[in-house]
Amino acid sequence: MTEQISAATLFLTTDYRMELHTIHTGLFKLDGGAMFGVVPKALWQKQIPADANNLCTWAMRSLLVEHENRLLLIDTGIGAKQSDKFFSHYHLHGDMSLKSELAKRGFGLEDITDVLLTHLHFDHVGGAVERRSDGVLEPTFPNAQYWSCERHWQWAMNPNPREKASFLSENLLPLETSGQLVFVPREDRWNRTAFDQRFPGLEIFFADGHTE
């Protein structure tokens, strides 16, 4: 099982003022059976209908957190650097992009101070790295620290065959070599952990697999 930082339980106190913005980064399609597993199709298709090929449409969203002079982006969407074949395979659509959605709120890529990656599947971390005009891959946010979990990072760098397609080295290696990657300290597995002193009141916990 994969280990990830659960973004679902990040905001646990209300003693500090934070402004939250939903950032839409596009839509894509995945097989409904693969996503819902043992849940019968008769149940899940009532909420998320599938097309003729059993594909369901999924939204990719990031969360932007404003606190004092810090801008924290939680997840980055699929990004724009992959091949047309890759995007066609996952039926990427929608006119939203990370850069344009941030610009609508008055922010540029250089304004982001922190990026928290809940886990390292390509639809969550792809936008963390961009491809320059000369083909070189580099972090999308030049002034940001990128936060992840060391144990999950090692898993993503050495995945099992079943998960290999979800972890792309081009999304990870440029962060590791840039010097911008930081690991969130992991304490007791089931205890909440303070994220960073610059975001007081912001806590996380570690979970195996996807969470709600």
Residue ranges and their predicted role:
Residues 12-13, 19, 25-105:
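Conserved beta-strand hairpin/beta-sheet module of binuclear metal-dependent hydrolase folds
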